[in-house]
Amino acid sequence: MSELKAPSLQSLLESERGSTDSLLAESLQLDFEDLDDAEFAIPPTDVLPTLEAVLSEFEADSDVASEFGMPVPHATPTPSIGEDSTIRTDGRGGGGSIMRYTLLHGISAQLSSAAERVNAGAASSCAVAAFIAIGTSHGHILNFDVTQTLRWAHQDKHGQGAVASLAFNADSTRLLAGFSRGLVAMLDTHTGDVLRELFDVITPNTGVLHVKWTSRSSLALCADAGGSVWSLSFTRKLGIRGCQSRCLFSGARGEVCAVEPLIMDSQGRHELDQYCIVALATLSKYFIVTVRPRLRVIKYHVLQGPPDCLPLLAWHLVLIQAADTSRSVDPVIVVGRGNQLFFHQLFVSNGRITLLYLRHVQLQGSLLSAHWLGPKCVASLDTAEILHLVDVRSSKELECMDMANAGLVYGSAQFKGLATGGNVSPAFALAGSNACYNSVVSRGTQLYVLGARSLHIIGVRTWSERISFLVKHHRWQEACQLALDGYIASVDRPRKRAQAKERIIMLFKEYIANSARAPEYCLGAIVNCLITVGELDLLWTQLWEKLHNSSTELFLQHISEHIEKETIHSVNPVISQALVDYWLEHSPAKLEQLILKLDWMCLDLNQVLKAVKKHRLFRAQIYLNTQALNDYTAALTELLPLVTPDETDLGNCLLVYVSSCLAGREYPSGEIPVELVHQVKHDVLRCLTSQHSKENAGDELPYPYLRALLKFDTRETLNVISLAFQEREFSNELGISHRKRIINLLLEIMSPENATWAEIGCLLNFIAQQISMQCLPRDRQLLERVLSHLAQEEIANESSRQHSERENAWHELLSSNCLAEISSDEEQLRLAEKAKCYCVVEYLLEKLERYDTILDSYIRNEARHETMFAYMERHVASPKRSIFRQLKRNLRELLTINAKETTRLLSLHYPEKINELLDNLRREENLLYLFLKCLNDRKSELEASQMELLLELYCKMESSSTVEEFLRSNSGYRLENAIAIAESHHLNRSVIYLYEKQESYAKAFELSMELLKSAAGEEAAKEAQTISALLARSVETLPAQELERCWFALLQYILPHQELQSITKSLLHEASQHIDLHNLVQLIMNTHNVSTSFGDIKDLLMGMLDSSRHKTEALRASAGALCQDLHLKFVKRYQHAHRGLWVTTTKCSMCRQRLYDHSQVLIFGGCGHGIHEQCMEESETQFEECPRCFTAIPDQSIGLPRPNKNLISISSSLEMGALQLKAPPRRFI
């Protein structure tokens, strides 16, 4: 068994180069030449698979993963990554189907072995390209190939600490490694040989944070813990490898935390390929720079965020569609910090590199990393170690996965500089406390998460893989919906659409194979998929056969839903028979709806026709007769005899059918074929106007079919005929003769013996409209017959609608001048007035220009009262309309109809006529009250006499409370007259209010006492409280003696009454503020029915004392607060008075001489300018603003008294030219 053991990691480290073969193959010592490639299915060695292709085979939900010992996740997957750890997924949008989790067991096992056997330490950083390189905390580097085979291992011999950062170049031939104590090493990825060891390419005594290759094969970037960024140019001259280091960004100007070069695989097809572009981010901003051909800053932005969060940068090429529908593939950078993600597009415009802001996404928690997983998604890991997958276009979170148990490696030690003595700034150390730049990396659509002894992959499944995942977990509903979404999204791409259709068919076959036990499960989604992709044959054959004995009813229900939605128009004949049988049993009405939307050719006509006749499905019967039998008259001859006033559905259905046929439209929808239109119209019209039916009973009246329709609904039948008359067939001479014939038939059918006057009226109105529209010739006899009907004075049971139709028909005949030959306008006017057709009257008056009586026609017509005021408003400015004369003549009627609108019209256009109109209404108090009330409501200025008249009318017609409310809300009356009016109507409360308004509180009190004496019970208590409030309001007006007398009078009445004891205490408390306490107690003691013991008045006296104490304390507190406020103000002003003034100039603003200390100086305030007091006196002008800068001067001018000591010596002032003040300067604002 010892021969089967793999060589140890120590042996690899001691060898000159790493292993180039598989460890397992080396241990077995197999002879590869003896193996047959075909027999063992060995792939060709010259074409190696990509890393993504190989790693995608090890997905957690595949059988291969299960063989490796990883359990397949179910609805809530928890795949094993170790002995005690799990990964939890939360499918918020994708239901756990979008992200695929994989644990690389081979690499994880090698990491554990290295840590235990050779003391390599925990993993510290990783890099992924064609190989997977992992650095450890003790300076070891392990390189794996795509099969997770360890190719070689490298151990640092110089004690440079942990491997802080790793980076592969573009062709994966070189590996850069940065160490925590400053060493940068370059290794050959195939052999593991060290090609370069660079000890002095960064800031001394600092560690490496990042090493990154740029788009140039010989140029790399390195960022150190001091915040500086260095460019490393690799050279090879005469076989000697060298490196030139250059500082691009110094940490003294800002500490760079993140570096991300732009690397595009466009092979020179993009305009940006000629530039070497790098994104840098500090703790306060991020910026885009070009390193080649010359160093230049393209753009920078401020970047804010929490102090313990690092900035994040990631590039990706994205297809961008502009607003003008143009498309371009440009690099897009995502910049993140805190919970914010910003997206910017980098492109070349007019030869200049431009950075364009695209969108902003805000997440829930603070971010640790952000990486592109394809051009549409960004994976972000937050501080709770939850991985969020965000759709860039919709800014929505698709799915999330809990990575807390993956054991994520943090690089906080490098940011804190622990390996170099901690010589980093506190802000840098705080920000790097959760750094994971080099332990979470991405490549393509896969994210690599490095644990201490494990490596995890989170990939984004493709559309097809997601469907397979959902199918495997029997989530058919989601799988079908996802498949349909992909099919619909590929509408503009035929190849993609064909692939999507093929995948849906495959999904259907998987459903058939897995639904043996419960075939009805998710049946609706499968049916929807097949109908959407047009695979109806599978629906009618395989699926129907699968469900034939178990779930046919559910299948038929789903098919019916799609027929109603008109997504399918034809079904298999076998299924159509089953469909008819099913719905005949459950809902014949539903069957009728389905028949109308199905192609008749898929139906069993014998079965369906029998069913529709048996169950009276008239619409379906008409549809089948016209479509299947091509007979457009059979429905009329069979169904019209069945029409009765109670058969509303059948009657309406036939009316719609006849209207459609005469208009050339199919029933219930569509168009009749062009070649059949004329024949169909002719056949239907001939059938309707046939003199006898097929049965031809002996007592049958002529024209039974048309008669049946007219009997069912005369008005709608005539509307159908009116629409038919508009068709082209009735516009020529033959069509006009057909019109005459139909009109004669209608007149013959609608005789007084066989029709009501309402029905005959509808017919005559119809004829009048046809004549007015020039659809019928002007036949004098016909016109006279029509006019005799229109001019009838009374028609029994005529509704308002019928009367309106009669008016409209008459009006149309007049406007088209059809009645000029048989009657004059004057005669028409008399007939219209007798028939009460006031619209016709108005038209004739307008025509005869007799405008002064038009308003009368509006007043008589109740239906036109609302439009009457619009008519007056429209013509109020026209003198010939005589609007005011008509208003004055009909004022009483107008006020009765709408007093508010009448008043508005008069006050707006005729304010000077108001008094005249009021005089005309003096004898009609009701109308006068309405008019005055509306004027007052419109806030019109009424005279005092008019207000008093309105008050008089209020007193007569409204309640006392309404009168009092009117008095309170208006003030245009005279108080003496108002009091007299109110007293004459015995409205005592209104009188009391007027006395109070007049400040005659004594009279108001006496009258209130009379009301109190006449009241009893609760009403008396309310009245007493009202009087108390009255006396409280009279304090400032009544003399003290009069006020005390009133209170004594009130209390003398209240105290003896036992029913008022409930308010006695409150009244005594209120009275104690206005009556001497000794007199009040004496009054209580002397009052009849009140005990003189101390116990009875104890509560009163204690209440008085408590009130007095509270008021005393309140007064003391108020006085203290006032004194304190005054003291604070005094202190503030005292402090201001002891502060010096800030003077900005040493020259007088008037005389421009120096401000010497021997003269008085005035300072203007906040501007700091000053003048001599003598200059101000000489100018004899009161300055309101500074003469120098025109700043407003405060009301209280500030003056500087002459000081006792010289503030400026003459010599120093002449030399320095400035004032020197001892007090600190201040500004006045």
Swiss-Prot record:
Looking at the keywords, is Transcription regulation present? no
Q: Name one GO molecular function term.
A: GTPase binding
Which BP terms in the Gene Ontology apply to this protein? endocytosis; endosomal transport; endosomal vesicle fusion; endosome organization; protein targeting to vacuole
Which proteins does it associate with, and in what oligomeric form? Component of the class C core vacuole/endosome tethering (CORVET) complex composed of at least Vps8, dor/Vps18, car/Vps33A and Vps16A; unlike in other species, Vps11 is not part of the Drosophila complex. Due to the reduced number of components the Drosophila CORVET complex is often referred to as the miniCORVET complex. Has a higher affinity than the homotypic fusion and vacuole protein sorting (HOPS) tethering complex-specific component lt/Vps41 for Vps16A, car/Vps33A and dor/Vps18, the core components shared by both tethering complexes.
Role of this protein = Part of the class C core vacuole/endosome tethering (CORVET) complex involved in endo-lysosomal vesicle trafficking and lysosome biogenesis by facilitating docking and fusion of endosomal vesicles. The CORVET complex acts upstream of the homotypic fusion and vacuole protein sorting (HOPS) tethering complex but is not involved in autophagic flux. The CORVET complex may cooperate with the early endosomal tether Rbsn-5 to mediate endosomal fusion. As part of the CORVET complex recruited to endosomes by activated GTP-bound Rab5.
Q: Which organism is it from?
A: Drosophila melanogaster
Which SUPFAM superfamilies does the record associate with it? Quinoprotein alcohol dehydrogenase-like (SSF50998), RING/U-box (SSF57850)
Gene that encodes it: Vps8
Cystine bridges: which residues? none
Name of the protein in question: Vacuolar protein sorting-associated protein 8 homolog
